[in-house]
Regions:
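Acyltransferase
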Residues: 116-120, 144-168
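A short helix-breaking turn/cap at a secondary-structure junction
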Residues: 61-147
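Short glycine/serine-rich loop segments
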Residues: 2-99
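Residues at alpha-helix termini
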Residues: 33, 58, 123, 159-160
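Beta-sheet entry/capping signal
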Residues: 37-38, 129, 162
């Protein structure tokens, strides 16, 4: 849960008894339930991305300095960043374009990125060795989820030079 003293816990939009994923969870729930069209949040260790994934929306963690943040403690740089959330990648990207830029009160902010909408280079996945793990070796998974994961990953394994099932040590 995301707990707030006045209003209580914010539950997951798919099952209110479960967590919304973290500190930007209220924004993710508001997006998922149609309360707002766009939202922003901060990300230190997954605070945008985790709630977005738990709530079925998109969260982007920009590189440090892309979105200026006046008043951010210097000790948290470059780990803490501000970023967008949206219902779709296009929505989140649109907000990122609006957020990106410099601020005279943030000495770590970077010059605006002018090529955010340039096409990405095509990656040659055929030269990449991939390790595929459903649980990173530390999270218990039910047989049902393991089966779903195996089915889903079977659709893209062939794109890699090598794809092995393993977990990090």
């Amino acid at each position: 849960y995301k707990r707030q003293l006045v209003f209580g816990a914010t539950g997951n939009p798919f099952d209110p008894a479960k967590t919304c994923g973290g500190s930007s969870g209220g924004s993710a729930v508001a997006l998922a339930t149609g309360m707002v069209p766009l939202a922003s949040g901060s990300d230190y260790g997954g605070s945008l991305r985790t709630p977005a994934s738990f709530c079925g929306v998109v969260g982007i963690r920009p590189s440090p300095g892309v979105v200026a943040a006046e008043g951010r403690p210097v000790g948290l740089l470059p780990f803490s960043v501000l970023g967008p959330m949206g219902r779709t990648v296009d929505d989140a990207y649109m907000l990122l374009q609006a957020q990106a830029g410099t601020d005279p009160h943030d000495p770590f902010s970077t010059a605006p990125i002018t090529d955010l909408d340039s096409p990405l280079e095509q990656a040659d996945l055929g030269s990449i060795r991939a390790m595929i793990t459903p649980d990173l070796g530390s999270a218990a998974m039910s047989h049902a989820y393991s089966s779903i994961f195996a089915d889903r990953t079977s659709h893209f394994r062939h794109h890699f030079a090598t794809a092995i099932d393993a977990s990090p040590d």
